[in-house]
């Protein structure tokens, strides 16, 4: 199972430097079970409205991207966030050397709990932390 981070979803929906790599990975990965969480929906809404506020996307483009993003998330195995995920995320954030932000620690904690073996993320700090939790990384540049 592969946990889908919101930044990968954004690269599928909006022009990003990594969009071609992500599209290529997804095209080669149709048999993978993708996992997400309700938190991805929240981050998606936030990321899209930031694109609108910064004039990178129009209101109409945001609406279209939001619909597409929610459809992609609906096709994933959406796992609920549990109290234990927050506790584990807090423990990860408490490790000063990790530099993890709370939202990223929450993604990692949930992915680990539900048995994901791999993380699909482009976040540098998450990519550094994931292997320490026994999670493999998708290399989008292959």
Give the location of each predicted region:
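Acidic, PIN/NYN-like endoribonuclease modules and their adjacent C-terminal/linker elements
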Residues: 1, 108-142
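Short, well-structured N-terminal submotif of metal-dependent ribonuclease cores
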Residues: 1-40, 51-64, 132-133, 142
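Alpha-helix capping/helix-boundary segments
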Residues: 8, 40, 85, 107, ...
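Short amphipathic alpha-helical interaction patches enriched in hydrophobic/aromatic residues
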Residues: 8-10, 48, 52-55, 73, ...
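Short active-site oxyanion
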Residues: 31-34, 75-77, 113-118
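Aromatic- and histidine-enriched alpha-helix N-cap/loop-to-helix transition segments
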Residues: 36-42, 103-106
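Acidic catalytic patch
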Residues: 70-97, 104
């Amino acid at each position: 199972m592969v946990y889908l981070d919101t930044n990968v979803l954004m690269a599928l929906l909006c022009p990003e430097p990594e969009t071609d790599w992500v599209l290529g990975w997804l095209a080669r990965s149709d048999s993978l079970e993708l996992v997400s969480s309700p938190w991805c929906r929240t981050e998606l809404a936030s990321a899209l409205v930031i694109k609108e506020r910064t004039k990178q996307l129009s209101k109409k483009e945001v609406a279209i991207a939001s619909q597409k993003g929610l459809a992609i998330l609906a096709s994933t195995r959406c796992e609920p966030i549990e109290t234990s995920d927050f506790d584990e995320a807090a423990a990860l954030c408490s490790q000063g050397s990790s530099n993890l932000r709370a939202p990223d620690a929450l993604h990692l904690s949930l992915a680990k709990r539900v048995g994901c073996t791999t993380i699909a993320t482009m976040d540098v700090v998450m990519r550094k932390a994931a292997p320490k939790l026994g999670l493999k990384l998708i290399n989008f540049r292959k």
